[in-house]
């Protein structure tokens, strides 16, 4: 199956038909919810009961990730390059707003009349203090984020960042678009805030390019890879912060990795001693080196009981 990014611009791929399909698929909704919950976990936000966070959702699409933010008590603003996806998101927000106001389905939704333009946020009135509604904006993230400095407490992005690695016009240079996006993100985040951007790199070089562009504008952080040995469950999360010396957390492990660790503990229990290699590259050093490569998004072979073991001397 070809990648959507290779078919053209995101605004063309996510048309009205694809937007409805995207929002009605139970599998897609479940995956989006799981990824969003993981991104919020990596943000390490204070409890919303104490103080709700103001969060920017870049590439918000049909508002599936925004719905999770609302359920956790946070306030959010979403931007996306696809008008059709925003129409679906606005319909859901409008229905929730009418339901909170007690109007239900009696009043007709005016979602089809909404216009989404750059620098124009569709503010939803909120008469119910217990309900939160997302604000939507039609905008291309590759041109930078048009918000005031230090506006947001945090930022999330689900399955959108990799689109900046592809060029659909002569003036769309991936490195420049990535740098422009990260530079503006650095400005709109409040100091002490974080950003967690989940993306699907086609190659290891794309993951390195994204990380380098983020570091160039001043961000600290790294790439967290969940389930690195799974073809379907593998997920990349770029965690960005202002904290110098920040070390990205270790990604979630799959069954295979857990099994290897259990075997390692059993070997320790048997008090098997591994002699240090002459060149200084012990098994611990090799495992640490492989883990570092995984965080950079590179393809690394799975750890086994033979990792770091000396080969037999043969003629």
What annotation goes with each model-predicted range?
Residues 175-191:
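A short glycine-rich, Lys/Arg-flanked "PGG" loop and its adjoining helix->strand segment in the class I
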Residues 54-144:
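Class I SAM-dependent methyltransferase SAM/SAH-binding core
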Residues 192-199:
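Conserved beta-strand signature within the Rossmann-like core of class I S-adenosyl-L-methionine
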Residues 234-315:
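C-terminal lobe and adjacent flexible extensions of AdoMet/dcAdoMet transferase-like proteins
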Residues 219-230:
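Conserved S-adenosyl-L-methionine
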Residues 157-160:
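A short beta-strand submotif of the Rossmann-like class I SAM-dependent methyltransferase core
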Residues 1-50:
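Conserved class I S-adenosyl-L-methionine
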Residues 142-155:
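A short acidic, Gly/Pro-enriched loop at the edge of an enzyme's catalytic core
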